[in-house]
Amino acid sequence: MFILLVKVQVKPELLDEFKSAILNNATLSVQRDPGCHRFDVLQQQDDPTKWVFYEVYDNEEAWVLHRSSAHFLAFKAVGDRALESRDVTKFTGINVKS
């Protein structure tokens, strides 16, 4: 599994627009993108400008395909204006079998 942990900080004046865009992107990613298994969106309780996304894909190729989707490109257009900072960390999922 290919996993992304994305941390962003959003400009306060664009929070509502950003929230709508990321929720649409996350929902459509899981529904439509082949190989996208999970897309969790978290907003920090004590600072609503800070967000974390937890994304799970079959492999990096599935993530690359996701980045060419119409819903991602629509989100990116908003994110490019709304984000103050972004940090992306890539992980390999390790499955523990009992």
Feature-to-residue mapping (PLM):
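Glycine-rich beta-strand-turn "strand-cap" elements at beta-sheet edges
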Residues: D40-T49, F75-S98
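Active-site-flanking beta-strand signature of metal-NTP-handling nucleotidyl enzymes
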Residues: F2-V8
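An amphipathic, aromatic/His-enriched active-site/gating alpha helix that lines ligand/cofactor pockets
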Residues: N24-C36, V56-T89
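Short, glycine- and small/hydrophobic-rich beta-strand elements in well-ordered beta-sheets
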Residues: T27-W51
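Short, conserved charged micro-motifs
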Residues: L14-F18
